[in-house]
Amino acid sequence: MAPEKRDPSKSNLSAVRENSVMVIGNFDGVHKGHRALLKAARLISGDTEKPISVMTFEPHPAKFFNPDIKPFRLTPLDIKTRILDDLGVEYLMLSTFDENLSEMTADVFMRKMLVNANPSHIVVGENFYFGKGKEGTAQMLQDHSDELPFDVSIFKSLSDDNNDVYSSTRIREYIQAGDIQKANNLLGWKWEIEGTVIEGDKRGRQLGFPTANMTLGEYIRPAFGVYAVRVAISSDDVTPAKWYPAVANIGIRPMYPSNEPLVEAYIFDFSADLYGKEMRVQLVKHLRDEAKLDTEQELIKQIRQDCENARSALEQTK
């Protein structure tokens, strides 16, 4: 999977979706619960060779209803699209969540929007809601399927061995708490932050630890602190991603405060100029919280320890 940040319109996913088995949802994080729905859709398709499609919404409904909401996305649209593409989804119906859609009744959503999409079968989770004020439920959709030109299958929410439900909300809670390993377990992949490398104040270089920096953009803010990470730099759509071990500070740097939280990654045994490149930072383990130290010498000593701890954590987590 090449570490390329791409325009969803240039994805391999097509907008054509007639006669497909369609899964509907926001798919933020494309976690294990979402993947189970996609697997169910593929089983329903079976030997019929009907394609798998996804209907999703942009902007996220939470952003539409609360424009000032703090950043909360696990996977911005371009990242979500790439993951769905990699998972074998063939068609994507990207529905603009605007005032018209927010005011649409459940009946109109079923009988016009879904009928116009022309799927042969629709797959949803049990907590799927639609229509103004969430008046439509998954059960309502299935109850009306005899009157509609498609079948409907509902699947219950799944959980891990500790009864932790696979949900975007739960994953966000873990990320904000710094429990990245639990978040990654529910995701089924190691959560990443992707963005363009920007020019910083070169403070890390002066200390002997040059960093590649980027802003957090739409991404939910993880617990500020130091993380063991792996980093991939943009290449192309053919060459597999090459991941480098690294340590990263995510936050506002208490000793040298910044107005905006940054991801600052020190890539081990790496020296190339990365300004303007697209970078993916895969979070593996939260090592410690941010801390304001008294002197630069103390900071250098702490960074060295962070590097050792990160290397150890990465060796234990493949």
Model-derived regions: residue spans:
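A structural signal for isolated positions on well-ordered beta-strands in alpha/beta enzyme cores
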Residues: 51-53, 91, 121, 153, ...
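Phosphate/ribose-recognition catalytic cores of enzymes acting on nucleotide-derived substrates
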Residues: 200-318
